[in-house]
A protein has these predicted regions:
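Iron-sulfur cluster-binding cysteine motifs and their immediate structural context
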Residues: 50-75, 94-127, 174, 181, ...
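Glycine-rich dinucleotide-binding loop and its adjacent helix/turn
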Residues: 127-144, 202-222, 245-308, 415-426, ...
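A conserved FAD-binding loop/helix module that cradles the flavin
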Residues: 440-465, 471
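Feature captures the FAD/FMN-dependent oxidoreductase FAD-binding
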Residues: 80, 144, 149-153, 201-250, ...
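Rossmann-like dinucleotide-binding cores of NAD(P)H-dependent redox enzymes
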Residues: 172-175, 179-210, 214, 302-349, ...
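Ferredoxin-type iron-sulfur electron-transfer modules in oxidoreductases and energy-metabolism complexes
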Residues: 25-44, 64-97, 114-144, 268-269
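N-terminal Rossmann-like FAD-binding beta1-loop-alpha1 element of flavoenzymes
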Residues: 149-174, 298-306
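FAD-site-proximal beta/loop scaffold in flavoenzymes
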Residues: 254-286, 371-444
Length: 476
């Protein structure tokens, strides 16, 4: 295949991702984006300008050699592309699906200055899937054993990354997960139609083949304390996420039919409530469902409600579409599926019937004022604008908080006023030998930011195991 000129690369249009038809996909839980074939992936890869100073790499928390793996796809060497991805990331097939590339690597793609950026995320998905389903990538040999042992708490994106990187460095790694299935938010929070659980399982299989020991149903803070783990291991990484739901604290929030997004999605994703009674966990299958919030979790919840049989799925959001934190792709998918978006509305109370089941949400209309600390325009209530949205199920998706169980048994590991661990940029906590990263440090954020935190922490843990040095300025 001949080398293309820059002009020829620029002349190739960005390839769209094929999707299931919206009216078909709301009747199933299959992945919405169906993926590319080889020819499409090669053609898209040939758009890459192979920059000498690739800003896409600078903007990738997982530190992936993006031009390197894309070049291999363009040459038809798909397994080599996957090898480059796995050298930097334990979860490339996951990231190819859920990472917000449009605000990170693709945002700084030089092609995007005049044309559409190279579809880096879709190419990452293609190459990673190739190695999972078509031609298995040989497991690399780890470094010689160091004799050092590391406990990783939480088998979510940060913990999986730390475990995968440290095992390659020759350390003995045990990954502890509180639930019966590893994956963290990847399995309990993100629906099957956006991230198939098989993908998570296969990527976990890879780090287990490398030698990571996985222990499920192990609740750090109950089964064992952080202090007890430190007696057995040379270092401990805390990546237990932000799994405790936030609530509005308005009247009626304890009515039947009102769920936190955490409970609603966990019942559906992890417990397979949509297969009740084959699976024993039920969930309300409302016909008119309101989801409160504007992030990716809210989009996941409202789209889940449609697949559970809702006639109407509503988003109630107190700002406008412009301020919505959800990925534009997820908003557009929800719009295609018929979700009704109610902007500039704020719930003030839930209304119930004589059986204590929710029947309505009373809202106030809002207008936007000056930007607040988040940089988004602050919503201001319009006096006397109350109205009621009739519903039979409500999902509150306004954020997550730190679960205090782990911190309560971590002597000397300080938390901030919101219960998140205090750590430096490399994940070192206020107690020597204890590291933390991901949502339990930053608050609820993206999968890729948790992966980036995991990579930094893994390097810091490796350094600590080698030299034993610990800064005395953390938290000061």
């Amino acid at each position: 295949m001949k080398e293309l000129t820059i002009a020829e690369r620029c002349a190739i249009p960005r390839h769209p991702m094929p999707h299931q038809d919206p009216q078909e996909r709301i009747r199933n839980f299959n992945e919405v984006a169906v993926g590319w074939d080889r020819d499409t992936a090669v053609e898209e890869a040939r758009r890459c300008l192979l920059c000498k100073n690739p800003q896409c790499v600078v903007n990738c928390p997982a530190e992936i050699d993006i031009p390197g793996f894309i070049k291999k796809i363009a040459e038809g060497h798909f397994l080599e592309a996957a090898r480059i991805l796995r050298a930097s990331s334990a979860l490339p097939a996951v990231c190819g699906r859920v990472c917000p590339q449009e605000t990170q690597c693709e945002l700084t793609c030089v092609m995007g200055r005049k044309y559409e950026p190279v579809a880096i995320g879709r190419l990452e998905r293609f190459a990673s899937d190739y190695a999972l389903f078509e031609e298995e990538l040989p497991v690399p040999e780890p470094a010689p054993p160091t004799g050092k042992r590391v406990a990783v708490v939480g088998a979510g994106p940060a913990g999986i990354t730390v475990a995968g990187d440290l095992i390659k460095m020759g350390h003995d790694v045990t990954l502890f997960e509180a639930l019966h299935q590893p994956g963290g938010v990847l399995v309990y929070g993100i629906p099957e139609f956006r991230l198939p659980k098989e993908i998570v399982r296969l990527e976990l299989d890879v780090i287990e083949k490398l030698g990571v020991k996985l222990v499920t149903n192990f609740v750090v803070g109950r089964t064992a304390t952080v202090d007890e783990l430190l007696e057995e291991y040379d270092a401990v990484f805390l990546g237990n996420g932000a799994g405790a739901p936030s609530f509005l604290n308005i009247p009626g929030e304890n009515l039947n039919g009102v769920y936190s997004a955490s409970e609603y999605l966990t019942r559906c994703n992890l417990m397979k409530a949509y297969q009740f009674p084959t699976h024993t966990t039920p969930v309300a299958r409302g016909k008119k469902v309101a989801v409160l919030g504007g992030g990716n979790v809210a989009m996941d919840a409202v789209r889940m409600s449609l697949r559970l049989g809702a006639d109407e799925g509503h988003i109630l959001y107190r700002r406008s579409r412009t301020e919505m934190p959800a990925r534009i792709e997820e908003i557009e998918n929800a719009e295609e599926e018929g979700v009704k978006f109610n902007y500039l509305v704020n719930p003030v109370r839930f209304i119930g019937n004589d059986t204590n089941w929710v029947t309505g949400v009373e809202c106030l209309r809002m207008e936007l004022g000056e930007p607040d600390a988040s940089g988004r325009r602050r919503p201001i209530p319009i006096k006397g604008s109350e109205f009621i949205v009739d519903v039979d199920t409500v999902v509150v998706a306004i954020g997550q908080n730190a679960n205090p169980i782990v911190a309560s048994t971590a002597t000397g590991v300080e938390t901030n006023e919101r219960g998140y661990f205090i750590a430096d940029d490399d994940g070192r906590c206020t107690k020597p030998g204890v590291f933390a990263g991901g949502d339990i440090v930053t608050g609820a954020a993206t999968v890729i930011l948790a992966i980036g935190a995991g990579k930094k922490a893994a390097r810091a843990i490796h350094d600590y195991l080698n030299d034993g040095k610990w800064p005395d300025t953390i938290g000061k």
